[in-house]
């Protein structure tokens, strides 16, 4: 909407701007995000939470926590900060595989370490965890790097890249590439980009544009602008339906976000965690019918450079399945209370045939499977990083970019109903709430 109204028209006054923000959801987002302030070792002056919540059918942003205090930090964490995607990028390989006729019941070797074509350094799962042949459902639930690099080798990295862009990851995202390890998320999107891309999945393959201005009227009530956007089909319904068992496995059982299913038992839940290998960032993008929410966490020093999220809450390591999931639950549990239905209405039966049976891997040392919350990490070759961006390693390695200098815009909210002050860093009414709520759930390794 900002491009349709110049400064002269805005300064003349008389415009009535309505945002998409739902006051109750905004309050819930602030309470959930600022619950991190109660966690031992968490310092909101350097450690940041970004949360965006969207209606996947319309693209309307329902809530946005973009920083603790805009007067102290003039940076929108949702639309300007960037953080390494890590394993939150893996679903795009599942989509690429589905486009080629594959199924999430295809099997691959989960052996760790593994060497792949053109690589002098092996790919590893977190902590040296090694598995036998597993389906992509289990590999997604456990976030196995070796399996997903093997999958990416089969589907070809450029197809994973295309799936990500089609879903909603901008083509100019820092670190986005068509190399074999792109599946491990060396790219650094904005929080809102992940919300948008996962909304495409949650909407059965139709992509919508994220927006925070619902409508603009003049002083006489004449409609000057409407944020309504027509969805664009980028994946077939059957393709998206076919990958859902893998994404649903993440949020239950032994998945890296297993607490989600029991917390929101009334609705079908799905999503993916993501963590950088040096704990420079951690995030969880999860969705239910009618709502998608991404939670990103990262840390910067006084110079704006990314530094590890360590010494937080007594944990040795910081994963997407830890506090990002907790904050997601703290927000989504009340926010979804009035959503209708229990499953995604667009889902169809998928009768795909398994077309890949992995060879039996050579014997290797196998250790106990990771517990819920932990997810595998791996170190690929570094990617080039602009000097203006702080560097950050993906969950799987690579020098990417976190935090402070993303190339996004400020979502230019200007809305008149932004609820309470999550300090969205937008131009709108941040009605400064006094929120310190949000209880932090039990810790998981």
Model segments located where?
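Non-catalytic structural connector segments
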Residues: 1-18, 31, 41-47
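A penicillin-recognizing enzyme superfamily signal
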Residues: 19-42, 51-53, 64, 70-84, ...
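Short, glycine-/polar-rich solvent-exposed loops and beta-turns at beta-strand/coil boundaries
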Residues: 43-47, 108, 175-177, 262
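Conserved catalytic neighborhood of penicillin-recognizing serine enzymes
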Residues: 102-160, 207, 219-249
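Mid-domain, small-residue-enriched loop/turn segments at the edges of structured enzyme/sensor domains
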Residues: 120-128, 156-196
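Proline/serine/threonine-rich low-complexity "mucin-like" segments in extracytoplasmic/periplasmic regions
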Residues: 346-445
């Amino acid at each position: 909407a900002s491009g349709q109204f110049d400064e002269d028209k805005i300064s003349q006054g008389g415009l009535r701007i309505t945002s998409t923000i739902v006051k109750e959801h905004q309050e819930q987002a602030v309470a959930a995000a600022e619950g991190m302030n109660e966690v031992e070792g968490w310092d909101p002056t350097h450690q940041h939470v970004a949360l965006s919540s969207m209606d996947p059918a319309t693209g309307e942003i329902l809530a946005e926590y973009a920083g603790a205090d805009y007067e102290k930090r003039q940076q929108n964490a949702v639309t300007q900060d960037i953080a390494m995607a890590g394993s939150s990028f893996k679903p795009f390989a599942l989509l690429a595989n589905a486009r080629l006729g594959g199924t999430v019941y295809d099997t691959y070797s989960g052996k760790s370490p593994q060497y792949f074509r053109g690589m002098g350094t092996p790919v590893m799962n977190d902590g040296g965890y090694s598995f036998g042949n597993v389906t992509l459902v289990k590999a997604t639930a456990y976030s196995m790097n070796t399996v997903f690099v093997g999958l990416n080798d089969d589907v070809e990295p450029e197809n994973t890249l295309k799936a990500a862009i089609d879903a909603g990851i901008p083509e100019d995202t820092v670190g986005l590439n068509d190399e074999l390890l792109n599946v491990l998320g060396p790219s650094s999107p904005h929080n809102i980009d992940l919300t948008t891309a996962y909304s495409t999945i949650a909407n059965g393959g139709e992509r919508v544009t994220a927006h925070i201005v619902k409508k603009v009227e003049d002083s006489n009530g004449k409609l000057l602008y409407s944020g309504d956007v027509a969805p664009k089909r980028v994946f077939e319904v059957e393709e998206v339906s076919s990958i859902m068992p893998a994404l649903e496995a993440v949020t239950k059982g032994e998945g890296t976000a297993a607490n989600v299913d029991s917390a929101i038992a009334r609705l079908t839940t799905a999503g993916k965690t993501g963590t950088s290998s040096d704990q420079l960032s951690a995030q969880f993008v999860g969705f239910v019918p009618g709502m998608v929410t991404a939670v990103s966490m990262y840390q910067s020093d006084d110079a704006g450079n990314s530094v590890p999220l360590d010494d937080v809450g007594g944990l040795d390591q910081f994963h997407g399945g830890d506090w990002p999931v907790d904050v997601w639950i703290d927000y989504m549990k009340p926010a979804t209370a009035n959503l209708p239905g229990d499953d995604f209405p667009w889902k169809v039966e998928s009768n795909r045939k398994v077309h890949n049976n992995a060879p039996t891997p050579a014997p290797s040392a196998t250790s106990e499977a990771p517990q819920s919350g932990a997810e595998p990490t791996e170190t690929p070759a570094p990617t080039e990083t602009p000097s203006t961006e702080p560097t950050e390693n993906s969950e799987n390695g690579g020098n990417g970019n976190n935090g402070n200098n993303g190339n996004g815009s400020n979502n230019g909210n200007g809305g008149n109903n932004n609820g309470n002050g999550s300090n969205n860093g937008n131009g709108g009414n941040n009605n400064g709430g006094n929120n310190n709520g949000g209880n932090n759930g039990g810790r998981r390794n």
